[in-house]
A protein has these predicted regions:
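Short acidic/histidine- and often glycine-rich active-site loop of Leloir-type glycosyltransferases
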Residues: 73-74, 88-98, 102-103
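A charged, aromatic-enriched C-terminal amphipathic alpha-helix characteristic of glycosyltransferases
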Residues: 121-151
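Conserved acidic donor-binding segment of nucleotide-sugar-dependent glycosyltransferases
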Residues: 97-98, 102-109, 117-123
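Short glycine-rich donor-binding/catalytic loop of glycosyltransferases
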Residues: 64, 81, 85-92, 106-107
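Nucleotide-activated donor-binding/catalytic signature segment of Leloir-type glycosyltransferases, i.e.
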Residues: 27-47, 51
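Acidic donor-binding loop of glycosyltransferase active sites
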Residues: 54-68, 81
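A conserved mid-protein helix/loop that constitutes part of the nucleotide-sugar donor-binding site
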Residues: 1-12, 24-27, 110
Length: 153
């Protein structure tokens, strides 16, 4: 889902990167990341993910597939963590540029590197992000939007 693009961009930067998850390309990614400050954490359960993502400066979603509504974006935002997401599928609809994160061109290592640097230099209001995301994605808010569709409002 864009792991190679992320690793290639991160190799050129002085920041520590922690990657959660795994898959059939993991060995290839580890080879690509050799000699860098990139740590592969493997699969994690939600309590660990919540702690890791909640403490992160920001989360990167380097998707190269058209995902309609990736939960990883919503989860990070609800934890107060800004998201740097690929401009593909439904991701741009979930990220308010400069407020809840930033976007980069999917599969574009140069743009991703530039946006990672921008994310580190940008100041986000983490508490406001968490609060607005929790309100936006709460059960009550979802129910109200669904009822508005049914009633034609």
């Amino acid at each position: 889902k864009g792991g190679a693009t992320l690793v290639k961009a991160a190799r050129q930067l002085p920041y520590k990167l922690r990657i959660i998850g795994g898959g059939p390309l993991m060995d290839e990614l580890k080879t690509l990341a050799a000699g860098t400050d990139i740590e592969f954490l493997g699969y994690k359960q939600w309590p660990e993910i919540k702690e890791l993502v909640g403490c992160a400066r920001f989360s990167v979603i380097p998707s190269e597939w058209y995902e309609n509504n990736p939960l990883s974006v919503i989860e990070a935002q609800c934890l107060g963590t800004p998201v740097l997401g690929a401009r593909i599928g439904g991701i741009p609809e979930l990220i308010e540029e400069g407020k809840s994160g930033m976007l980069f061109e999917s599969k574009n290592t140069v743009d991703l590197k530039t946006k990672i640097e921008a994310m580190f230099s940008h100041t986000f209001n983490y508490e406001a992000l968490a609060k607005s995301s929790q309100e936006r994605y709460s059960e009550d808010a979802y129910y109200q939007r669904l009822m508005n569709v049914y009633t034609g409002e």
